């Protein structure tokens, strides 16, 4: 039991680190010491005296960096919540949705352990202009953007998108697509119509860029 709990805590620590990296990579301020949190320090900070994870204590707010606010003025604040309950029903999701509304967060990220009921999932798109995203803990144990085969993706703002289309005399419909369900699109929180610049390494050209629109 203790060994299984240790493995579970280790996975949760890695998920927590990936979430912090994901939030930082979206342009929110995350201090370096938060990214460098060791497993032992994680246990001290987020586990009780019995060594059990206290997920509610892991929830946090993040604000855009100055650079991000200049590029994306409507970005707003973000709230990440780790759910204590193994299975998420309507009541828990409704509480989360109300929290996002009342505190006027622009984005709410809900991290769950096992599953969310279909009825609870129906609440997810219910509070525009705020966006709610859900992630399974297991999907974030490893940061996919750190994989050697995953190129760097950079989200463009509306001005950069318009300039791109003008430069290449393109319509939106002519751009290659990236699906919203793509793991990197989910990681960056891409919305329909947003464009990403993808930088790949080339043996002949050093680096080259391509562009995809989220659909």
Swiss-Prot record:
Cellular localization per UniProt: Nucleus
SUPFAM superfamilies in the cross-refs: Eukaryotic RPB5 N-terminal domain, RPB5-like RNA polymerase subunit
The keyword Transferase belongs to this UniProt entry's keyword annotation: no
MF annotations from Gene Ontology: DNA binding; DNA-directed RNA polymerase activity; RNA-directed RNA polymerase activity
InterPro entries named in the record: Arch_Rpo5/euc_Rpb5, RNA_pol_Rpb5_N, RNA_pol_Rpb5_N_sf, RNA_pol_subH/Rpb5_C, RNA_pol_subH/Rpb5_CS, RPB5-like_sf
One Gene Ontology term from the biological process aspect of the record: termination of RNA polymerase I transcription
NCBIfam families: PRK09570.1
Assembly and interaction partners: Component of the RNA polymerase I (Pol I), RNA polymerase II (Pol II) and RNA polymerase III (Pol III) complexes consisting of at least 14, 12 and 17 subunits, respectively.
Role noted for this protein: DNA-dependent RNA polymerase catalyzes the transcription of DNA into RNA using the four ribonucleoside triphosphates as substrates. Common component of RNA polymerases I, II and III which synthesize ribosomal RNA precursors, mRNA precursors and many functional non-coding RNAs, and small RNAs, such as 5S rRNA and tRNAs, respectively. Pol II is the central component of the basal RNA polymerase II transcription machinery. Pols are composed of mobile elements that move relative to each other.
Name of the protein: DNA-directed RNA polymerases I, II, and III subunit RPABC1
Annotated source species: Candida glabrata (strain ATCC 2001 / BCRC 20586 / JCM 3761 / NBRC 0622 / NRRL Y-65 / CBS 138) (Yeast)
Underlying gene: RPB5
């Amino acid at each position: 039991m203790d060994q299984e709990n240790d493995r579970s805590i280790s996975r949760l620590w890695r998920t927590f680190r990936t979430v912090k990296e994901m939030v930082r990579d979206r342009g929110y301020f995350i201090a370096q010491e938060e990214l460098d949190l060791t497993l032992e320090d994680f246990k001290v900070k987020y586990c009780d005296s019995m060594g059990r994870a206290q997920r509610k204590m892991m929830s946090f707010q993040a604000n855009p960096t100055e650079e991000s606010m200049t590029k994306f003025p409507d970005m707003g604040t973000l709230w990440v919540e780790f759910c204590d309950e193994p299975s998420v029903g309507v009541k828990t999701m409704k509480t989360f949705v109300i929290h996002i509304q009342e505190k006027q967060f622009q984005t709410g990220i809900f991290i769950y352990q096992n599953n969310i009921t279909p009825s609870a999932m129906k609440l997810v798109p219910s509070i525009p202009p705020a966006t709610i995203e859900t992630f399974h803990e297991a999907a974030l144990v490893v940061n996919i953007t750190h994989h050697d085969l995953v190129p760097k993706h950079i989200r463009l703002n509306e001005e950069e998108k318009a300039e791109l289309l003008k430069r290449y005399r393109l319509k939106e419909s002519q751009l290659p697509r990236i699906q919203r369900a793509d793991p990197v699109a989910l990681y960056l929180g891409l919305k329909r119509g947003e464009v990403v610049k993808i930088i790949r390494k080339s043996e002949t050209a050093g680096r080259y860029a391509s562009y995809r629109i989220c659909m």
